[in-house]
């Protein structure tokens, strides 16, 4: 089942255990990670970079693949689908595609613009019960 990373990590903190986040690049990696998480009875975060998203034909394809694999492989452990170091535009694509967590990397923007974009994305993500993290930069 796809869940919010925030929900997953709150349970992990309360239970004093860690949750692994593994970036996926193709169907085979995704299958291996999901089956291992199931075998270990461990929640897992599947991370996707923008490059991997392009390689796998877009974020909608990635989301559909992960959801189908969870069903077909009978995965019962919690799974979060996370955009790793995404652009502003990439975050919106993942929101529309059904990801459950996004990471906005606005570190290349001037701080004021980064904060404004982050606030906007936080509002959208929270309204959809999604997890969000952001990178401020230096």
Which stretches of residues belong to each language-model region?
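Surface-exposed amphipathic alpha-helices with a cationic face
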Residues: 66-74, 118-126, 136
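Active-site cofactor/substrate anionic-group-binding motifs, chiefly glycine-
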Residues: 39-95
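Hydrophobic faces of well-ordered beta-strands that scaffold small-molecule active sites
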Residues: 18-24, 44-48, 79-84, 102-104, ...
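N-terminal amphipathic alpha-helix/helix-capping segment at the start of soluble metabolic enzymes
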Residues: 1-20, 67, 71
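N-terminal glycine-rich anion-binding loops that anchor highly charged ligand groups
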Residues: 1-12, 28-47
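Active-site-proximal loop/short-helix segments
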Residues: 88, 96-99, 133-138
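Active-site-adjacent beta->alpha loops and helix N-cap segments on the catalytic face
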Residues: 2, 31, 55-63, 85-93, ...
């Amino acid at each position: 089942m796809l869940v919010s990373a925030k929900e997953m990590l709150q349970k992990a903190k309360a239970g004093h255990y860690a949750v692994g986040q593994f970036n996926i690049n193709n169907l085979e990696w995704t299958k291996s990670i999901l089956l291992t998480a199931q075998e270990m009875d461990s929640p897992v975060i599947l991370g996707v970079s923008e490059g991997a998203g392009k390689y796998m034909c877009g974020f909608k394809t990635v989301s559909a693949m992960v959801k189908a694999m969870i069903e077909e492989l009978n995965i019962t452990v919690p799974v979060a689908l996370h955009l790793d170091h995404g652009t502003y535009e990439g975050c919106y694509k993942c929101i529309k595609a059904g990801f459950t967590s996004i990471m906005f990397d606005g570190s290349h923007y001037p701080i004021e613009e980064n904060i404004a974009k982050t606030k906007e994305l936080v509002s959208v993500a929270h309204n959809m019960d999604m997890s969000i993290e952001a990178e401020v930069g230096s």
